[in-house]
C-alpha cells in the first residue's frame, strides 16, 4: 500500500494538534481527509508528496478583488484601523498581498517566498504553478506575492488577501490563474467596483472574468458585490441609476440574482450639502457596511462547513467523476491496443496465406523449410519462443504507443491540475503486469468503495455536530447571557490610526 511521505504525515499531525485547541470538531475531518488520501494514493490520483488535506486552507480566508481605484485597499485599512495598504486613484500595487496577524507593533512586509514555502498559508508552492503557466516565472515569485503582518485584533483567526487592481484586457495569464486560485480557496470574496465609472459596459472583459465564472458555482453565495465611492452620485442624486446600470451589466454576464452593497469612505467622501440627502446616503452606507462586516464575522463558522463540505465533495468526486473518467480512458486505451494487435495478427495471417500462392519453386522451398523445422523439437521450440517474444514485444510497444496517445488526448481535453491528476492515475493502469481487459481502475476495490461510503457518512455526521453547536430547533438549550456591547463586532467609522501610533 502506498503511504504519504514523512513531510505530509508531519504536517497532518501538526494540523490536528492545532485544531484540538481551535476547533475540535475539525480534528475528525483531518482523519477523513487522511483516509480519503489513502484512496487517492491507491488509485494514482494523488502523489505521495500530496494530501487532500493540504489542498484546502484551514484558516478562514477572505479575499478582496476589484478593478483599479475601486477602494479595496482603503476598505482594508479602515477595517484594520491601520494604514497597512497604500492607496491611490491609480494602480499602487501589482502583487497579491496576504495579510495576517502579527504580534509586533510595527507592520512587516515579507517576500513572496514566505508564502511559497510555508504550507500554513495560501499560495503554498505557487512557484511550481507559475512555471506551468510560463517557464521561469516561478523564480519571480516575489513579483507576484507578498506577506504583510499587522497587530490588529480583526486579523486574529482569519487571513485577508488583497489582490492587485484587475483588468482582464491587460492581465497576465499568471495573475489570472492566481486570481482563480484564491477564489477557489476563499470562504468570502469581496468584489469591489468603482461607482465613479458610470459605464460598466466598457469593462465587459473584466466583468466576464470576475462575475461570469461565478454564476454556476455551487458556492456563489460567498461572493459580495460592492459598489464603492457611491457618494460621487450625490451631486446628481442618482445612486439608483448607477446601481441599476451595474446590475444590468452583471445580468449581461448571466448573474441575475444577488445585490450590490453600496458604501463609501466618509473621510474621503464628496461633501453633501443637503442634510436630508447626506443622512440618506449615510444610512444606506451604514446598513450595507453592517451586513458586510456581519458576513466577515461569520467566516469562521462558514469555514468549518466549507471544510466538511470539501471532504464530502472530494469523496463523491472520486466515485462519480474520476472512476467513470478513468474507465473511459482505459476503454479508449484498450480499444486502440486491440485494434493494433488484431492488425498484427491479420498481417501475419495474410503473410501465411500469401505463401500458398507463391510460384511452385518458392512454395516447395517454404514447405521443405517448415518440414525441417517441425522435424526437430528443439528448433521448433526455439522458433516458437522467438515468435512469442516477437508478438509480446509488438504488443507492449503497442500498449506504450496507445497509452502515450491517450495521455496526449488528456492534455488536450483537460487543463492544468485535472490533466496532471488524470494522467498520473491513467498511467498506473497501463503498467506491464496489468491486463488490458481489466475494466476498473487500479485501486477501485471493494475496500476503497466502502471507505468512501464511510467518509461521506462521517462528513454528514460532522455537519450534524456543527448544527448542534449553532442551532437549537427544540429550544431546550439554556439561554446564553448576552455579550457586552463592547465585545460585539465593531462598525467602521472611517477613522484610521496613523502608522506612527501604536495600534
Task: Give the positions of each predicted feature.
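Canonical P-loop GTPase G-domain recognition
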Residues: 219-224, 229-303
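Cytosolic-side membrane-insertion boundary helix
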Residues: 302-348
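Transmembrane alpha-helical hairpins and terminal membrane-anchor modules
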Residues: 334-420
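Conserved G1/Walker A P-loop phosphate-binding module
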Residues: 2-142, 152-153, 158
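Conserved C-terminal guanine-recognition region of P-loop GTPase G domains, centered on the G4
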Residues: 121-159, 167-254
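Cytosolic/nucleoplasmic, non-transmembrane interface domains of endomembrane
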Residues: 12, 16, 66-72, 92, ...
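Charged, low-complexity cytosol-facing tails and large interhelical loops of integral membrane proteins
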Residues: 167, 178, 420-503
Amino acid at each position: 500500500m502506498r503511504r504519504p511521505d514523512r513531510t505530509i504525515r508531519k504536517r497532518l499531525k501538526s494540523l490536528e494538534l492545532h485544531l484540538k485547541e481551535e476547533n475540535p470538531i475539525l480534528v475528525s475531518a483531518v482523519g477523513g481527509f487522511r483516509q480519503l488520501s489513502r484512496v487517492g494514493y491507491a488509485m494514482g490520483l494523488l502523489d505521495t508528496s500530496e494530501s487532500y488535506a493540504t489542498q484546502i486552507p484551514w484558516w478562514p480566508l477572505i479575499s478582496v478583488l476589484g478593478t483599479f481605484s475601486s477602494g479595496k485597499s482603503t476598505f482594508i485599512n479602515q477595517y484594520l484601523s491601520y494604514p497597512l495598504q497604500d492607496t491611490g486613484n491609480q494602480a499602487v500595487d501589482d502583487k497579491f498581498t496576504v495579510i495576517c496577524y502579527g504580534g509586533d507593533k510595527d507592520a512587516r512586509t515579507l517576500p513572496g517566498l514566505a508564502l511559497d514555502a510555508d504550507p500554513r498559508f495560501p499560495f503554498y508552492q505557487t512557484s511550481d504553478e507559475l512555471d506551468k503557466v510560463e517557464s521561469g516565472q516561478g523564480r519571480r515569485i516575489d513579483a507576484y506575492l507578498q506577506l504583510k503582518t499587522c497587530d490588529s485584533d480583526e486579523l486574529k483567526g482569519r487571513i485577508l488577501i488583497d489582490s492587485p487592481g484587475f483588468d482582464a484586457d491587460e492581465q497576465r495569464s499568471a495573475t489570472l490563474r492566481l486570481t482563480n486560485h484564491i477564489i477557489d480557496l476563499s470562504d468570502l470574496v469581496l468584489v469591489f467596483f468603482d461607482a465613479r465609472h458610470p459605464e460598466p459596459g466598457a469593462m465587459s472583459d473584466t466583468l466576464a472574468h470576475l462575475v461570469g465564472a461565478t454564476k454556476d458555482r455551487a458556492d456563489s453565495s460567498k461572493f459580495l458585490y460592492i459598489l464603492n465611492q457611491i457618494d460621487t452620485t450625490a451631486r446628481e442624486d442618482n445612486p439608483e441609476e448607477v446601481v441599476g446600470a451595474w446590475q444590468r451589466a452583471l445580468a449581461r454576464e448571466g448573474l441575475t440574482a444577488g445585490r450590490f452593497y453600496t458604501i463609501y469612505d466618509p473621510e474621503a467622501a464628496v461633501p453633501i450639502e443637503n442634510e436630508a440627502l447626506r443622512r440618506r446616503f449615510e444610512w444606506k452606507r451604514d446598513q450595507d457596511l453592517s451586513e458586510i462586516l456581519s458576513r466577515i464575522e461569520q467566516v469562521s463558522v462558514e469555514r468549518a462547513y466549507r471544510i466538511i463540505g470539501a471532504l464530502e465533495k472530494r469523496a463523491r468526486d472520486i466515485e462519480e467523476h474520476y472512476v467513470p473518467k478513468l474507465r473511459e480512458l482505459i476503454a479508449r486505451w484498450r480499444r486502440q491496443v486491440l485494434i493494433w494487435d488484431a492488425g498484427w495478427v491479420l498481417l501475419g495471417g495474410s503473410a501465411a496465406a500469401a505463401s500458398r500462392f507463391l510460384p511452385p519453386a518458392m512454395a516447395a522451398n517454404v514447405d521443405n523449410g517448415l518440414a525441417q523445422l517441425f522435424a526437430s523439437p528443439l528448433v521448433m521450440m526455439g522458433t516458437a519462443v522467438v515468435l512469442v517474444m516477437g508478438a509480446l514485444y509488438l504488443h507492449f510497444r503497442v500498449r506504450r504507443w496507445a497509452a502515450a496517445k491517450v495521455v496526449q488526448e488528456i492534455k488536450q481535453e483537460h487543463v492544468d491540475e485535472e490533466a496532471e491528476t488524470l494522467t498520473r492515475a491513467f498511467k498506473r493502469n497501463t503498467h506491464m503486469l496489468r491486463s488490458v481487459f481489466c475494466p476498473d481502475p487500479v485501486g477501485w476495490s471493494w475496500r476503497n468503495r466502502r471507505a468512501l461510503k464511510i467518509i461521506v457518512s462521517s462528513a454528514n455526521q460532522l455537519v450534524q455536530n456543527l448544527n448542534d453547536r449553532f442551532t437549537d430547533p427544540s429550544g431546550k438549550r439554556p439561554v446564553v447571557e448576552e455579550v457586552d456591547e463592547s465585545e460585539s463586532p465593531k462598525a467602521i467609522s472611517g477613522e484610521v490610526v496613523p502608522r506612527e501610533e501604536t495600534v
